[in-house]
Regions:
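Conserved small/polar residues in nucleotide/adenosyl-binding loops
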Residues: 171-173
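Helix N-cap at the start of a conserved alpha-helix in ABC-type nucleotide-binding domains
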Residues: 155-157
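Conserved ABC transporter NBD signature motif
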Residues: 52-66
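Conserved ABC ATPase "signature" region
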Residues: 87, 91-94, 98-115
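Helix-to-loop junction immediately C-terminal to a conserved catalytic motif
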Residues: 48
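Catalytic Walker B motif of ABC-type/P-loop ATPase nucleotide-binding domains
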Residues: 144-148
């Protein structure tokens, strides 16, 4: 599904990625491990087309690959509730199917049926991550990229978010 070959990226004289090669198959869960500044987020941003690569090849195995992306610190409109936020996401991606039905589906997938009606301003970090994942999967992406989805979560929150991610890989989003 995702094939990266000889990927390079530098910031001035600082070479972050030097010939990265990797293959990710459908339903696989991959994680990047490494110290700060080694290129983990840069790689995700290049694959997500947020920043350009210097050189190399990225092949998704199909044209028009949809990517769902959750940054390390998701930006959300705190004056909205979860349902309103996902309605906004649906508008951004020009979602054409039954929007309300899909909002209910993703809210349930991430286990937020009750919390979706509360204002985002009152969400815990774990609830923010769940809503961010719901937004990332909203338009049925072919590839889901999550940048540190469990950082700053307590052990229970980490386990819950990892369970959601594992289940998403099983249902192919």
């Amino acid at each position: 599904m995702l094939h990266i070959k000889n990927l390079h990226k530098s910031y001035g004289a600082f070479e972050v990625l030097r010939g990265l090669e990797m293959n990710v198959n459908t339903s696989d869960i991959y994680g990047f491990l490494g110290k700060n500044g080694c290129g983990k987020t840069t790689t995700m941003n290049i694959v997500s087309n947020i920043i350009p690569k210097d050189s190399g090849e990225i092949n998704f195995g199909k044209e028009n690959c949809k990517i769902g992306y959750l940054p390390e610190t998701p930006s959300m409109f705190t004056y909205m509730n979860g349902y309103e936020y996902l309605d906004y996401i649906a508008s951004c991606c020009s979602y054409k199917d039954d929007k309300k039905k899909r909002i209910d589906e993703v809210i349930n997938i991430v286990g937020m049926a009750e919390g979706g009606k509360r204002r985002i301003k009152g969400y815990s970090r774990g609830m923010n991550q769940r809503l961010g994942i719901a937004a990332a999967i909203f338009d049925h992406p072919d590839l889901l990229i999550l940048d540190e989805p469990t950082s700053a979560l307590d052990p229970q929150g980490r386990a819950e978010v990892m369970s959601i991610i594992k289940n998403l890989s099983l249902i192919h989003i």
